[in-house]
């Protein structure tokens, strides 16, 4: 039995995800099957901006960014499984359960994220995810993403220069009044 391998290069990833530098954390999709699984790569470079402070002299890829990289992989799988979204729609990272970190990820590592579709219910899609370096598990988690609806156009608000004076703020115009009970 043969299976088709689907790969996605950075140009295709940029077409699917709204993330951009420095927050795009998926460099390539190695393979996927729509509605089932996706394997993606994050090449961890010492040039990542967060290594300046996490931690000086002992750079460690932040755990929350490992989770974000896996969440971005779930977003790609959702897009490839459900099709492109309507203008104004996004897939949002909606929740995480049972996140576990097994070992640090450091500059020079190539992190492989493997995400699998679990179920979809009431607009939420649940995925499991595993991140590995050199075949060794570095993180596991169960994640949810939600498909947003296009936002209604925002009302135009015009603030005239005479509405706010340096020593007076009109609460009914600039700051909504919050009544204490």
From Swiss-Prot:
Active-site residues, record numbering mapped to chain: 54
Record field: catalytic activity: a (3R)-hydroxyacyl-[ACP] = a (2E)-enoyl-[ACP] + H2O
Keywords: Cytoplasm, Lipid A biosynthesis, Lipid biosynthesis, Lipid metabolism, Lyase
Assigned EC number: 4.2.1.59
Annotated InterPro entries: FabA_FabZ (IPR013114), FabZ (IPR010084), HotDog_dom_sf (IPR029069)
Cellular component GO terms, alphabetical: cytoplasm; membrane
Molecular function in Gene Ontology: (3R)-hydroxyacyl-[acyl-carrier-protein] dehydratase activity
One GO process term, biological-process aspect: fatty acid biosynthetic process
One Pfam family this sequence matches: FabA
Annotated compartments: Cytoplasm
Main location: cytoplasm
Domain of life: Bacteria
Similarity comment: family membership: Belongs to the thioester dehydratase family. FabZ subfamily.
Function, in words: Involved in unsaturated fatty acids biosynthesis. Catalyzes the dehydration of short chain beta-hydroxyacyl-ACPs and long chain saturated and unsaturated beta-hydroxyacyl-ACPs.
Protein's name in the database: 3-hydroxyacyl-[acyl-carrier-protein] dehydratase FabZ
Species whose genome carries this gene: Yersinia pestis
């Amino acid at each position: 039995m043969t299976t088709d391998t689907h790969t996605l290069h950075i140009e295709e990833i940029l077409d699917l995800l709204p993330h951009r530098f420095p927050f795009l954390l998926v460099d390539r999709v190695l393979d996927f099957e729509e509605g089932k699984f996706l394997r993606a790569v994050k090449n961890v470079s010492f040039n990542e901006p967060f290594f300046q402070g996490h931690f000086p002299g002992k750079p460690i890829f932040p755990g929350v960014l490992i989770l974000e990289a896996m969440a971005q992989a779930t977003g790609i799988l959702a897009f490839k499984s459900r099709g492109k979204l309507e203008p104004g729609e996004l897939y949002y990272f909606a929740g995480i359960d049972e996140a576990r970190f097994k070992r640090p990820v450091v500059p020079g590592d190539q992190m492989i994220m493997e995400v699998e579709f679990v179920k979809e219910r009431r607009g939420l899609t649940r995925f499991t995810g595993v991140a590995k370096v050199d075949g060794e598990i570095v993180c596991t988690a169960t994640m949810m993403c939600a498909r947003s609806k296009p936002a209604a156009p925002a009302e135009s608000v015009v603030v005239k220069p005479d509405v706010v004076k340096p020593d007076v703020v009109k609460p009914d115009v600039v700051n909504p009044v919050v009544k204490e009970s």
